Amino acid sequence: PGAVVLAVNDLCLPCSDPFGMDLSHLNLEVRAGEVVGIAGVSGNGQRELMYALSGEEPCADAASIQIQGQAAALLGPQARRSLGLHFVPEERLGRGAVPSLSLAHNMLLTRQEAVQRSGWIDMNQLQRQAQGVIDRFKVKASGPQATAKSLSGGNLQKFIVGREMEAQPRLFIVSQPTWGVDVGAAAQIRGEILALRDAGCAVLVVSEELEELFEISDRLHVMAKG
């Protein structure tokens, strides 16, 4: 593995959800060219950690999360994307995709370059990119104009994972990467994760599937009670 891309330093984050889990003095690092897995029964702080890493839950201590050496804990999701972070949340609809928008428009969540300086959106570019994800990840959809909510859970999962991977991330964080997909698609997603690693990307995978984590992880951590 190469240089540290993600560093989590003594992260403490009280949970705003009464049914959630506080994060307490959590330390973690992910280096370029490695896959780090996080195992554990759901409800032990994995979701809260994902919110903290994605920028949905800003942290009080700016240095508690560093991306490529830059303090990132106070940055929002878009600013973190500019540092090379791409993210697949556990919740597909609502967080990973906007249900009522087309797949092409959902590409905008990670393809800000399609918005021109004039403010116009390059729809041809978005449609080409969406079609590329559909083809590469064998997403069953009528085309780039299909709405996100029209896809089955497994096909939407493939689209979201593919959209984030095709952005060529420096840091790729994914929660439950193969939930709801068939055996063939799960094998492809795992293979694509390993290909990202081999290309020098730092990868963090949260999964309840131990066999999956054993297959793809270079290092493995277990979360318990935050």
Positions of predicted regions on the chain:
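Glycine-rich phosphate-binding loops of nucleotide-dependent enzymes
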Residues: P1-G226
